[in-house]
């Protein structure tokens, strides 16, 4: 294939056929940084208790939430038996304006994405997700071919989302809403 984004179609076909495969000189589509980031936004939008997704995207794109703030969030979560989301919410209410504003911006982005999850077709959901999250702009700023390739991969993820319901059973409106799939 000529573009890394095109590998997704081939990989999906191989996976559906349940054939073992190995990629030489590259990374599997769903293992790529930008794809994992986008899927983590989707996971957190559907379940804000998902600590792995939270950790992956809390500062992607950069919001000024550093290691010190993450350590505070983890400690607060551990001490109060909270999810990282819950601990970050608590920290945002009890911290200085810089940390508080950065966390509130993050919550706002995830909340906007979450509200779309039940009201959009899955393709439209992912299209909006890559824009609202800032991932498309963030990766588009990477220099040269690397940035272009990452943006193409995000666009391919949107196309892949359109195909989630075109295979197998009849797709109806209820089934094509994100709230009914497991990411």
PLM segments and residue spans:
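Conserved RecA-like helicase motor core of SF1/SF2 enzymes
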Residues: 27-28
